[in-house]
Amino acid sequence: MDPAMCSELLSFLKPETRADVRAQALEYILGVSGTPEGRQSLCAEPRLLQVVLDLTTEQSAHIAQDAHHVLVNLTSDPTTHKSLLGHVPTLLPSLLTLLQDPTCPFSDSTCTALCNLSREEESCQSFLQTLKQEGLCQLLHMLCTPKYNGHASLDYLGPLVCNLTQLPEGRDFILDRDRCVIQRLLPYVTAGSTVRKGGIVGTLRNCCFNHRDHEWLLSDQVDLLPFLLLPLAGGEEYTDEEMESLPPDLQYLPEDKERESDPDIRKMLIETVQLLCATAGGRRIVRQKGTYLIMRELHSWERESYVSRACEKLIQVLIGDEPEAGLENLMEVTVPPDLEETFTRVDQEDEGSLDQ
């Protein structure tokens, strides 16, 4: 941005300037933040960024709202994150304070900006360092408290927590056996908006990469599997013998039982179950719980090819032979790079042919 233009905007945004002039200047910045070039130019101006952040608490609702929208636009571009966090060290603490305020009318925008900032691993690491244990506990409390903020849905808390679990520290918090964190999330697999549910299911999927926790996750202490299978189950009839093999929560479902309507969430649920099959103990429990029956009926019902493909992969594991000795833990098997490339290419070709 031209230095003269930046100085002029800063003069228009001073607290003593008339509110209508400040509003017009901020509207201009909001427009600039809507393009990739504009975002890069704004992120090169630390003083301007700080002023925009300060305006998120402006008494004028219109100005505060536009300031939030500018930050949402800026954070939507991953290439800006390093500049934003470097030029404005108070950005993360300030946004977290706004998010945790149950009276803030713009918390949905704040949550979206933080969700954007936590997508990339490097900025996510900065976020976790800012949050610390107390902040993580507060985020979970907000996520599990209906109407925590009467002015905002806070649906993007789901994807935000999911982003944090891309890192081992985030997963370790959710999987803390003393805090019973993951158990508090399970009811929300089938409750709330698609955005919130998708974030919760994504969190569970990320946590299942910690293969040493699989048997605990499948034990009665957590009982994760029924929560994953219920959204995938319909109202199909089973034989008495088949019904007995299913977890109690999946037995005798009503004929009008509907499956999860979002195909991306269905795919994530299937992938989460497949991750639990990566260990010998996990495969044994998943098979014993009648998972194949749910997948069989889902595959017959499913109309989205990419979800059907995920279903087929899981079924292959469920009905396949056990790996040879020494290869029981699929997450610890080293795949040569050339074979990995071949498998990836075959998967892409299969998905392409299914979409045609």
Swiss-Prot record:
Gene3D superfamilies: Leucine-rich Repeat Variant (1.25.10.10). Belongs to the HGH1 family. It holds the Pfam family DUF384. The lineage of its organism: Eukaryota, Metazoa, Chordata, Craniata, Vertebrata. This is Protein HGH1 homolog. SUPFAM superfamilies: ARM repeat.
